[in-house]
Swiss-Prot record:
InterPro entries: aa-tRNA-synth_I_CS, Arg-tRNA-ligase, Arg-tRNA-synth_N_sf, ArgRS_core, DALR_anticod-bd, Rossmann-like_a/b/a_fold, tRNAsynth_Ia_anticodon-bd
Catalytic activity: tRNA(Arg) + L-arginine + ATP = L-arginyl-tRNA(Arg) + AMP + diphosphate
Protein name: Probable arginine--tRNA ligase, mitochondrial
Lineage summary: Eukaryota, Metazoa, Chordata, Craniata, Vertebrata
Domain of life of the source: Eukaryota
Length: 578
């Protein structure tokens, strides 16, 4: 695979540069394929070898590359070495390239790219990923979709790299909003509606009580009293709250099943309502609590003692806040999991909140606060269903399935499917995930129903179509051809481009593992699918000599395998027919 070639190049370079091969391997990268011209297979940035390259001109660097190229010799692995602008370029023996790459893809299967030497010094860690985190008693809003699919991707990637991952869904099941909801249900709730469509009814009640609270201060007072009763453990208030919670989780579980997502632990803010009192006691024992003129209890984070930056940890009526419960949750998780890293996947509007939580953990003496990380993301604009209004995830999933079924029905090449609804949902979800993951996570983006379902271009539908097409090719010709294959005959430009691209998969995985951005994998898979589409037209399997047909089938099988691996990391279930 790529690293076998990298090591061979690194060993040659080490003899000339008097550096250990290990220090050079990560500086040698596979060259991205080009539509315009044939490219080398690997390149070394000469800048990476120069300690003081800030003072080196382009001419100096180019001269260094040329002199270095002259000292290196071709061998059985490398057939050509050339100096480019600021780079050294290496071309691999074509027959060796073909055999090695296809053999590695076949042998490694779902681990292809993950066994690379790029990850050889990666310590295995215990990692907690908190994601999704919807608020109970509300229908699953589409705003939680990003946290859900991003968190799932991060957990998938970390797990694939051999880390021990715990997926936590930290449900918003406590707080002042439940004072409002409890009061609202007592004023406007109907038992019959709660039984037939629980979360829609609770949402309607919540909207109504919020409107009333704006005009009637007595409603706000009742809400504060209800939440205070919850915090004090009032049986009647807790019973109603527990019912809302159970109904919510029941519905959320169905949504996660449709998304193909699971959690190791369902936790909630309510679990930490008592533990948050321990946090307050610890903060008090360290002399960190101060009371404001309004009676709220705060921690001064300014560092200057002027209260220019504070975090409120308790209201004037003695009830806890989100930040206090988050502190309790972090401390409990460290006790329970002894994590090396804890990742919170939440929108960028929460950035200040997490900065304050991490800062308070440090002030409290928890050095492991450095291991906590917030992965922020932007908002989705324009994701509304045909009905308009507030967009619930269930409505989006239903619309995804409906639109995809219509698209599939209008395409003549659509196969007869055993379960068209399931296929439509999987393809539709791929479309939504790819549109979401194409850019940087921190960026807001404009959702487009029309763009998301295009079968051509850079879409999730195109990825699924490519995978299904390659499955059909294998199904049509079976394994017989593979036995007769002589992969060394794969020397056409289309074959070489695919092989060169397959070389890069480990680098792409490495990039995503460093910055936790799925866009690298998305871009890679889209390019792979475009290369496969071109090759499918030009590299015929049917009517070719058996050894050529077998070799091409072997190539397409490798593409399908890597495509499926990448899609699964992104949280997409590949379809075999569509």
């Amino acid at each position: 695979m790529a690293c076998g070639f990298r090591r061979s190049i690194a060993c040659q370079l080490s003899r000339v540069l008097a550096l250990p091969p290990e220090s050079l391997i990560k500086s040698i990268s596979a060259v991205p394929v080009s539509k315009k011209e044939e490219v080398a297979d690997f390149q070394l940035s000469v800048d990476s070898l120069l300690e003081d390259n800030n003072h080196k001109s382009q001419v100096d660097t180019q001269d260094q590359a040329r002199r270095l190229a002259e000292k290196l010799k071709c061998d059985t692995v490398v057939t050509a070495i050339s100096a480019g602008p600021r780079t050294l370029n290496f071309k691999i023996n074509r027959e060796l390239l073909t055999k090695a790459v296809l053999q590695q893809v076949t042998e490694d299967g779902c681990k292809y790219g993950l066994k690379s030497e790029l990850f050889s010094d990666l310590p295995k860690k215990r990692i907690v990923v908190e994601f999704s985190s919807p608020n109970i008693a509300k229908k699953f809003h589409v705003g939680h979709l990003r946290s859900t699919i991003i968190g799932n991707f991060i957990a998938n990637l970390k797990e694939a790299l051999g880390h021990q991952v715990t997926r936590i869904n930290y449900i918003g099941d406590w707080g002042m909003q439940f004072g409002l909801l409890g009061t609202g249900f007592q004023l406007f709730g109907y038992e019959e509606k709660l039984q037939t469509n629980p979360l829609q009814h609770l949402f309607d009640v919540y909207v109504q009580v919020n409107k009333e609270a704006t005009d009637d201060k007595n409603v706000t007072k009742l809400a504060h009293e209800f939440f205070h009763r919850l915090e004090m453990g009032d049986t009647q208030a807790l019973s109603l709250w527990q019912r809302f919670r159970d109904l919510s989780i029941e519905e959320y579980t169905q949504i996660y099943k449709r998304l193909g997502i699971y959690f190791d632990e369902y936790s909630g803010e309510s679990f930490y309502r008592e533990k948050s009192q321990d946090v307050l006691k610890l903060l008090d024992s360290k002399g960190l609590l101060q009371k404001t003129a309004e009676g709220n209890v705060v921690v001064d984070l300014s560092g200057t003692g002027d209260l220019s930056s504070v975090c409120t940890v308790m209201r004037s009526d003695g009830t806890s806040l989100y930040a206090t419960r988050d502190l309790a949750a972090a401390i409990h998780r460290m006790d329970k999991y002894n994590f090396d890293t804890m990742i919170y996947v939440a929108d960028k509007g929460q950035r200040r909140h997490f900065q304050q939580v991490f800062q308070m953990l440090k002030i409290m003496g928890y050095d492991w606060a450095e291991r906590c990380q917030h992965v922020p993301f932007g908002i989705v604009k324009g994701m509304k269903t045909r009905r308009g209004g507030v967009t619930f995830l269930e409505d989006v999933l239903n619309e995804v399935q409906s639109r995809m079924l219509q698209n599939m029905a209008s395409i003549k090449t659509t196969k007869q499917l055993e379960n068209p609804q399931e296929t439509a949902e999987r393809v539709g979800l791929a479309a939504v995930i790819i549109q979401d993951f194409r850019g940087t996570l921190l960026s807001d983006y404009q959702f487009s129903w029309d763009r998301v379902f295009q079968s051509r271009g850079d879409t999730g539908v195109f990825l699924q179509y490519t995978h299904a097409r390659l499955c059909s090719l294998e199904e049509t010709f079976g394994c017989g051809y593979l036995n007769d294959s002589n992969v060394a005959c794969l020397q056409e430009p289309q074959s070489v481009s695919i092989l060169q691209h397959l070389l890069r998969f480990d680098e792409v995985l490495y990039l995503s593992s460093q910055d936790l951005q799925p866009k690298h994998i998305v871009s890679y898979l889209l390019t792979l699918s475009h290369l496969a589409a071109v090759a499918h037209k030009t590299l015929q399997v049917k009517d070719s000599p058996p050894d050529v047909a077998g070799a091409r089938l072997h190539l397409f099988k490798a593409v399908r395998s890597v495509l499926a691996n990448g899609m699964k990391l992104l949280g997409i279930t590949p379809v075999c027919r569509m």
